């Protein structure tokens, strides 16, 4: 309560204002914000209004539509201003009052008899909202008071207690109202009718503020009336009206009247029951069960009966709880549950109905059919009290929707105990019908507990508790209605216990559909039988309420903004807010469009959709129907269509509802490739898309409050009929889940740990989430779920933990979990793993390397730092230069150094003869790159897929170029994807691709000079055995016009020369050159493992393996120790096929030698049969030998070489070389070998070609110079290409 000491000293000075009359429904003075600050006004402070008449005292509020400029204007209600004597536009002086007295009691008087009668009918509304209309009062003042939106009365302030010039109404102020009755009219209502008349208008007992209706100058023997002024003249008052009024008040507050006379036992309760049934209420209508509680449930002790198990609360659809709450009315009715379409279908299957009946049950349901089909449900009806909130709105809804098909008239709230006992699930549909049976008075009751009671409790204790409960729950005018058996909860020593309250009949005929009344008065002549032994309680294991096992939006991470915007769309579609109901009532439900959530596999689109449904279920009280389309894939079209129809019918039945079609693209999507357009699955998807489109059209025409959410991998993966811009726009809100960035990955990881372990993440002191998020680039939501499981497994494998609370994860656990883990988004992406090469394995190209590091490597290493740059980062680089200068090698090295995923695309492999397939291939490759980001997308031979537009007769490359332009510089842009392109003919590329924002950085890879050639030779020969006389400086000086690829070929030829020289020096007989060459090929590892001349600037793995250089012929033939190696490759059955031959026999049949090695090896006796036979292959699945083609022989030789190298490295043959034994000749490359090889090797690019490339690149770098040299002149108006 505001005390006068708090307001002491508040305010100061005054201000002259202009009075403006308004239609506000209150007695406040509305002041602008500037004037409030000027007068230093406090809340609930009084203001003195001074003008030519007697000053007035008013309360103030701050106006919301005043402008900051202009004169001071004070707005006031027109009726208030006129009663005070103010004029519209007049000048008054406002002065803040420093002291305000809180009134303990205020005497008021209606201004006329009409005001008194209106006050009697709307006493509750006045009590509830009086403080919202007036706070400051003063004697002899007349104020208007609004009892509803259109009706107001005038009251005059008679006196204030304590006496003061003005005072403030508080919540505990007693309001004494003097009646103003008509003299010549007598009230002829009976006592019961008078009580009933007042009871139905009673609204809510507001805490603290209690209204006392008193009269002056009444007879001294009237109960409950006090005399306040004996000297005043006697006012004629209708004594019967006042007496009935006070009897009503005594009944409401459970006051026991001293003189209650009844003509017959129970007649009063029966008459009250009949009077309630005579009210005009919308009985025999259909309502939807909701979980939101109406205003009437919050009433105090006077209406505590409404809290009990026997009352339900009905209110209209658009009831606003924060607005003025309407008064409620109490009646009795029968409640029966109606079966939903899904329940009817289940019942049909159980009853094995005829085909005609089954067809009838599957037809759409309307309100008339519902009423006729459920007459048999009357036997299961329950009679109870019905509390009607907003009765006027419900009656208006019946009038306005008389010619419109409306399923539900309003909403009904049923207490959980009563709802579960009646087997009514949430959001079910019930029908309330009038009670046509006259109630009876029970003569005997039986109370029996449904659970064990304390041993020291007695029957009298149970009776006492039951009598107390009945007194608090019922009154004479509001008796309790029970059927044959009810379940109630009584307060015992051990808390609330459930009891069975049943009627004891004297004969069996009384059990036919009777209802009974109970009240404290009737209980005096009713016998109560108490049984202390608990009755057998039937265990009902089935849960009738539909529980959504979904996560909330707050439990997800990385999709907060996306979830909020999606929930906003669903909220507006279901008219979940007042603004939506005012502005979007014509486009509610599916008319507002469906929501489509797209994202890659494992991105969390289904989890997000379920979380949105969970929020709609909790906040909007919406029913949720989920259809898992993945489970419907492969079924017949009729079954899928029937499942969708049942789901939508169930949603309409329980509206407002949300229908979730999870993975819709699996049953109504496009084929993966154009070749499958006429496959059976594609035809079924098309038919299903048509059926779903027609179904949605039908429900849109019905105007139902149903929202639709669908998930798919992309908008393009759905059938075009569902996402078409023409016809019905089904999906008007599309939300795409992007791959998470580092901050979002940290949020997702934190929430996954919380959901898994149900603990506080702050207790994991040794867990660095930022570090784990940085190491999980390219991960999506599902990957984090698996990663946390792997981390938990790693923790449990290191330490035995008994409870979940003791489980503490660390960064080490996640590091172990990341080993060998491939994210789901990368499993379907064909990534290319670059070779294990670093910058130290590249010779020359220093400037190019620095550009790549600044553009790609540093932003990938420090993303937070580069994210703060105000300019857009470059994401596209074109590498151009002559063949063999190391362009492809640079792409692989930068991918390895930056630790990003690498996707390599050869130009021609994107082109297709089908229309649209090439563009789709370009889109797919960028989608793969987005899924694998951070990623480097490398286009080799770029000129083959992006030539100048207009030069292709088919138009395929033109469409590819257009698609590349869209992907490289689209509206959404590339995030985390760098595009590298390599070409030797940049002049052939469409210039539009080389403009800023696309491949805006063109880097020239020049041919190596002498210094660069020396670096390349050092890198390539790093693992080769070189003799001491080798002078690479001299080799670099005499290799002009050699590229990196040419230098690699030079070392390769020098290696062959060294091999030939070693064979000759070993005393071998002269043989053909092809034999020697073939032998060397079988004993060497090639410098260039993969084809492609651009990988030539350096290669650290291309050296000759020392373990394979030894020329001892015992290594060529497999001995017994290496027998298992051949079994590993050729299969386990080759031994049985060859018999128990020796190793030489096995070698002669299984060893795969070079195809050219068909002659005798010189100096190797006894081995003639070894290489004379053609290579064959024996496997476990085939009998006999299989002839190999040339390609299969080459592949077989390469695989055997790899197996030999791995086997020898594991068996430690290198170490065995140092053991005592025969001395093996070592291979070494000398200067003579290099010079001899140089004589046989020539550059791959001639001098004329070098000149052409030089002119070409010069003109590409300086386009103006090219135009000047060409001398081309353009005439005005001449048509030229913009390319």
From Swiss-Prot:
Its main location: cytoplasm. Gene3D superfamilies: 1.10.8.60, 2.40.40.20, 3.10.330.10, P-loop containing nucleotide triphosphate hydrolases. Belongs to the AAA ATPase family. PANTHER family: AAA-FAMILY ATPASE, PEROXISOMAL ATPASE PEX1. Its EC number is 3.6.4.-. Homooligomer; homooligomerizes in the cytosol, interaction with PEX6 promotes dissociation of the homooligomer. Interacts with PEX6; forming the PEX1-PEX6 AAA ATPase complex, which is composed of a heterohexamer formed by a trimer of PEX1-PEX6 dimers. Interacts indirectly with PEX26, via its interaction with PEX6. The keyword GTP-binding does not apply. It comes from Homo sapiens. Component of the PEX1-PEX6 AAA ATPase complex, a protein dislocase complex that mediates the ATP-dependent extraction of the PEX5 receptor from peroxisomal membranes, an essential step for PEX5 recycling. Specifically recognizes PEX5 monoubiquitinated at 'Cys-11', and pulls it out of the peroxisome lumen through the PEX2-PEX10-PEX12 retrotranslocation channel. Extraction by the PEX1-PEX6 AAA ATPase complex is accompanied by unfolding of the TPR repeats and release of bound cargo from PEX5. Changing residue 705 to W: In HMLR1; results in mild functional decrease in peroxisome biogenesis. It is linked to Peroxisome biogenesis disorder complementation group 1: A peroxisomal disorder arising from a failure of protein import into the peroxisomal membrane or matrix. The peroxisome biogenesis disorders (PBD group) are genetically heterogeneous with at least 14 distinct genetic groups as concluded from complementation studies. Include disorders are: Zellweger syndrome (ZWS), neonatal adrenoleukodystrophy (NALD), infantile Refsum disease (IRD), and classical rhizomelic chondrodysplasia punctata (RCDP). The modification Phosphoserine is found at residues 354, 1181, 1209, 1211. InterPro entries: AAA+_ATPase, AAA_ATPase_domain, AAA_lid_3, Asp_de-COase-like_dom_sf, ATPase_AAA_core, ATPase_AAA_CS, CDC48_domain_2-like_sf, P-loop_NTPase. Keywords: Amelogenesis imperfecta, ATP-binding, Cytoplasm, Deafness, Disease variant, Hydrolase, Membrane, Nucleotide-binding, Peroxisome, Peroxisome biogenesis, Peroxisome biogenesis disorder, Phosphoprotein, Protein transport, Repeat, Transport, Zellweger syndrome. Changing residue 581 to P: In HMLR1; results in mild functional decrease in peroxisome biogenesis. This is Peroxisomal ATPase PEX1. One of its GO terms (cellular component) is peroxisomal membrane. It catalyses: ATP + H2O = ADP + phosphate + H(+). Residues 355-367 have a biased composition (Basic and acidic residues). Residues 346-367, 1260-1283 are annotated as: Disordered. It comes from the Eukaryota. One of its GO terms (biological process) is protein import into peroxisome matrix, receptor recycling.
């Amino acid at each position: 309560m505001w005390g006068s000491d708090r307001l002491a000293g508040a305010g100061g000075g005054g201000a002259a204002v202009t009075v403006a009359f308004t239609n506000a429904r209150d007695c406040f003075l509305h002041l602008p914000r500037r004037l409030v600050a000027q007068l230093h006004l406090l809340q609930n402070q009084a203001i003195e209004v001074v003008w030519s008449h007697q000053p007035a005292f008013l309360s103030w509020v701050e106006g919301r539509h005043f402008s900051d400029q202009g004169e001071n204007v004070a707005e006031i209600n027109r009726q208030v201003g006129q009663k005070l004597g103010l004029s519209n536009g007049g000048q008054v002086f406002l002065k803040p009052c420093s002291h305000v007295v809180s009134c303990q009691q205020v005497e008021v008087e209606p201004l006329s008899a009409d005001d008194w009668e209106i006050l009697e009918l709307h006493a509750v509304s006045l009590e509830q909202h009086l403080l919202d209309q007036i706070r400051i009062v003063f004697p002899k003042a007349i104020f208007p008071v609004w009892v509803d939106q259109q009706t107001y009365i005038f009251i005059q302030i008679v006196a204030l207690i304590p006496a003061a010039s003005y005072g403030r109404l508080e919540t505990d102020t007693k309001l004494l109202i003097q009646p103003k009755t008509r003299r010549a009219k007598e009230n002829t209502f009976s006592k019961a009718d008078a009580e009933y008349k007042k009871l139905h208008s009673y609204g809510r007992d507001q805490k603290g503020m209690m209204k006392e209706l008193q009269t002056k100058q009444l007879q001294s023997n009237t109960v409950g009336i006090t005399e306040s002024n004996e000297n005043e003249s006697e006012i004629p008052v209708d004594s019967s009206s006042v007496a009935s009024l006070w009897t009503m008040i005594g009944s409401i507050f459970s006051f026991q009247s001293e003189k209650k006379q009844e003509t017959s036992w129970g007649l009063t309760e029966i008459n009250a029951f009949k009077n309630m049934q005579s009210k005009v209420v919308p009985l025999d209508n259909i309502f939807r069960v909701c979980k939101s509680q109406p205003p009437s449930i919050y009433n105090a002790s006077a209406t505590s009966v409404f809290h009990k198990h026997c009352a339900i609360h009905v209110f209209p659809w658009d009831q606003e709880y924060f607005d003025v709450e309407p008064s409620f009315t109490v009646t009795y009715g029968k409640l029966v549950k109606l079966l939903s379409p899904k329940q009817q279908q289940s019942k049909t299957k159980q009853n094995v109905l005829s085909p005609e009946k089954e067809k009838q049950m599957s037809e759409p349901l309307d309100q008339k059919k519902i009423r006729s089909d459920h007459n048999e449900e009357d036997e299961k009806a329950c009679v109870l009290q019905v509390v009607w909130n907003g009765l006027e709105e419900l009656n208006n809804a019946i009038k306005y929707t008389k010619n419109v098909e409306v399923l539900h008239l309003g909403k009904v709230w049923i207490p959980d105990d009563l709802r579960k006992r009646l087997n009514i699930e949430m959001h079910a549909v019930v029908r309330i019908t009038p009670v046509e049976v006259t109630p009876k008075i029970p003569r005997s009751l039986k109370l029996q507990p449904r659970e064990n009671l304390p041993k020291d409790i007695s029957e009298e204790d149970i009776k006492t508790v039951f009598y107390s409960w009945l007194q608090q729950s019922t009154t004479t005018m509001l008796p309790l209605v029970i059927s044959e058996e009810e379940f109630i909860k009584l307060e015992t020593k051990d808390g609330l216990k459930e009891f069975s309250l049943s009627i004891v009949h004297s004969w069996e005929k009384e059990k036919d559909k009777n209802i009974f009344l109970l009240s404290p008065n009737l209980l005096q002549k009713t016998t109560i039988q108490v049984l202390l032994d608990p009755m057998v309680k039937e265990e009902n294991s089935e849960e009738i309420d539909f529980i959504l096992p979904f996560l909330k939006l707050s439990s997800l991470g990385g999709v907060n903004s996306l979830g909020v915007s999606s929930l906003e769309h669903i909220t507006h579609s279901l008219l979940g807010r007042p603004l939506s109901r005012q502005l979007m009532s014509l486009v509610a439900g599916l008319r507002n469009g469906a929501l489509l959530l797209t994202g890659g596999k494992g991105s969390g689109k289904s989890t997000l959709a379920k979380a949105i449904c969970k929020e709609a279920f909790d906040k909007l009280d919406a029913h949720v129907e989920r259809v898992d389309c993945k489970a419907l894939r492969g079924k017949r079209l009729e079954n899928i269509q029937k499942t969708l129809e049942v789901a939508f019918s169930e949603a309409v039945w329980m509206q407002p509802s949300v229908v979730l079609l999870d993975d819709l693209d699996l049953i109504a999507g496009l084929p993966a490739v154009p070749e499958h357009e006429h496959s059976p699955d594609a035809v079924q998807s098309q038919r299903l898309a048509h059926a779903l489109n027609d179904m949605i059209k039908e429900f849109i025409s019905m105007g139902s409050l149903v929202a639709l959410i669908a998930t798919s991998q992309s908008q393009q993966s759905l059938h075009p009929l569902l996402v078409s811009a023409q016809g019905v726009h089904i999906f008007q809100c599309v939300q795409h889940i992007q791959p998470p960035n580092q901050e979002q990955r940290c949020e997702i990881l934190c929430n996954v740990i919380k959901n898994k372990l149900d603990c506080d993440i702050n207790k994991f002191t040794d867990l660095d989430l930022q570090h784990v998020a940085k190491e999980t680039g390219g991960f999506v939501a599902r990957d984090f779920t698996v990663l946390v499981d792997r981390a938990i497994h790693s923790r449990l494998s290191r330490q035995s933990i008994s409870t979940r609370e003791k489980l503490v994860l660390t960064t080490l656990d996640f590091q172990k979990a990341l080993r060998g883990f491939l994210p789901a988004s990368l499993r379907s992406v064909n990534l290319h793993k670059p070779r294990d090469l670093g910058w130290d394995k590249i010779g020359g190209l220093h400037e190019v390397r620095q550009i790549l590091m600044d553009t790609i490597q540093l932003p990938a290493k420090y993303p937070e730092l580069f994210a703060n740059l105000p300019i857009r980062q470059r994401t596209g680089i074109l590498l151009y230069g002559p063949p063999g200068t190391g362009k492809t090698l640079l792409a692989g090295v930068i991918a390895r150094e930056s630790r990003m995923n690498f996707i390599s695309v050869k130009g021609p492999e994107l082109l297709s003869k089908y229309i649209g397939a090439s563009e789709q291939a370009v889109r797919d490759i960028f989608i793969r790159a987005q899924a694998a980001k951070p990623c480097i997308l490398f286009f080799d031979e770029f000129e083959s897929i992006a030539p100048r537009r207009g030069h292709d007769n088919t138009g395929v490359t033109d469409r590819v170029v257009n698609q590349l332009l869209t992907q490289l510089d689209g509206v959404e842009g590339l995030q985390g994807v760098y595009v590298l392109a390599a070409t030797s003919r940049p002049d052939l590329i469409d210039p539009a691709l080389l403009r800023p924002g696309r491949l805006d950085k063109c880097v020239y890879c020049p041919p190596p000079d002498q210094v660069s050639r020396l670096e390349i030779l050092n890198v390539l020969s790093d693992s080769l055995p070189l003799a001491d006389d080798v002078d690479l400086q001299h080799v670099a000086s005499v290799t002009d016009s050699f590229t990196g690829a040419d230098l690699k070929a030079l070392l390769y030829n020098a290696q062959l020369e060294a091999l030939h020289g070693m064979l000759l020096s070993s005393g071998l007989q002269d043989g053909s050159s092809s034999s020697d060459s073939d032998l060397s090929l079988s004993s060497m590892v090639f410098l260039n493992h993969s084809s492609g001349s651009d990988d030539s600037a350096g290669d650290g793995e291309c050296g000759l393996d020392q373990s394979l250089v030894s020329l001892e012929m015992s290594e060529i033939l497999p001995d017994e120790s290496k027998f298992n190696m051949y079994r590993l490759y050729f299969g386990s059955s080759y031994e049985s096929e060859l018999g128990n031959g020796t190793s030489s026999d096995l070698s002669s049949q299984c060893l795969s030698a070079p195809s050219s090695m068909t002659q005798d090896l010189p100096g190797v006796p006894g081995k003639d049969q070894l290489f004379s036979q053609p290579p064959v292959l024996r496997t476990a699945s085939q009998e006999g030998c299989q002839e190999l083609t040339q390609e299969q022989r080459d592949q077989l030789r390469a695989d055997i070489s790899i197996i030999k190298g791995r086997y020898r490295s594991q068996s430690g043959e290198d170490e065995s070389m140092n053991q005592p034994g025969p001395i093996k000749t070592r291979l070494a490359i000398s200067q003579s070998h290099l010079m001899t090889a140089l004589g046989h090797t020539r550059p791959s690019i001639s001098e004329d070609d070098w000149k052409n490339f030089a002119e070409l690149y010069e003109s590409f770098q300086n386009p103006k110079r090219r135009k000047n040299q060409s001398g081309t002149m353009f005439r005005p108006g001449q048509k030229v290409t913009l390319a």
